[in-house]
Amino acid sequence: MTKSLDRTPLTRDFFDRDVLEVAPDLLGRTLVRREPAGTIELRLTEVEAYAGEVDPGSHAFRGRTARNSTMFGPPGHTYVYFTYGMWHCLNLVCGPDGHASGVLLRAGEIAVGAHLARDRRVSARNDKELAKGPARLATALDVDRALNGSDLFGGPAPALSVLHGTPPPRDLVRSGPRTGVGGDGAHQPWRFWIDGDPTVSPYRAHAPRRRPSRKAT
């Protein structure tokens, strides 16, 4: 990280905006994970916006459930979900209370605490891969459902918080379809990333799940 880092925490008002404003504005910000083992700081390089009940790609599209209830809460909280029976993904809730929009944190560069991330991401070939993808990011930061609903502004040293960091120049911010989203939500250009950054994950279009074929007996 060559530019000076602004360590001022973001305010709740930052998240109390439309998700399509918040998502690209999170690029270059510093996500801080505090835990007993130490602190990890990550520069966000890739995110996706999910616009709640009006967005077919959102978990909140069909309304409130026990699983997604955190999304309907006030801005500046976390929404952590479990997927494919093995991975966690970290989202930051934004917009007005009850609006159910959020930003999926897809990738970032570990700037502080890489030794902690390496212990959890032993398959990473290098440090650029430690948080390259949403499941890898959550694993590197030791994020699971226990952190669902965490307040980014919950006291002087919350488990997760976001600093101003160093936003990239506007001409380096790119947008395109979200990874793995199909149906009516497939074409919104709501994935945002820093162009040319080696920690950004590769784009993958939606592929319908296929049931295993049964062999004839």
Curated annotation (Swiss-Prot):
Residues forming coiled coils: none
Keywords in alphabetical order: DNA damage, DNA repair, Hydrolase
InterPro entries per record: Formyl_transferase-like_C_sf, MPG, MPG_sf
Superkingdom to which the source organism belongs: Bacteria
Signal peptide: none
Keyword check for Kinase: no
Enzyme class: hydrolase
EC number(s) per entry: 3.2.2.-
One annotated GO molecular function: alkylbase DNA N-glycosylase activity
Segments for region (Disordered): 197-217
GO biological process, one term: base-excision repair
UniProt feature, compositional bias: Basic residues: 206-217
NCBIfam families: 3mg, PRK00802.1-3
Family: Belongs to the DNA glycosylase MPG family.
Protein name listed in UniProt: Putative 3-methyladenine DNA glycosylase
Organism: Streptomyces griseus subsp. griseus (strain JCM 4626 / CBS 651.72 / NBRC 13350 / KCC S-0626 / ISP 5235)
